[in-house]
């Protein structure tokens, strides 16, 4: 596990005492930028310079932000089922590169697969990473199947430490797993 980051104790104290708005402000103003920096330095060597990223978006923007800022994709697509304004705003605030938001009408296999295929034809690249961390389980399942079918790298942001009472990862313990790499896994 990572050493305690600079603002972790202060953030924890605020959150555990019910000061959730102040805790969230501290987290995104001070703590999260340090998390991003550490995550980038650990995992940026896993990706090519001309990578395309497709992210599944649920209610937590942090994993998308971590992966996007680590990969630094030439094109980035974020797929979601709803426009969650505050979540989208966080992604816009922290993601260094521009991204294309693609809202799908439902989570059926055909809708998700077709949306991914449209992106594939649009980018005309063979270096595609699909981040399956966010999104509904049905989206993640279809994205994983699609990634295997079209030889896309598949990533997942996990964590080593978890704060049960806050239902959040311990800051600084985030891990990037390459779940599937078509050049290695067959």
Outline where the language-model segments fall.
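Long, low-complexity, Lys/Arg-enriched
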Residues: 1-127, 138-186
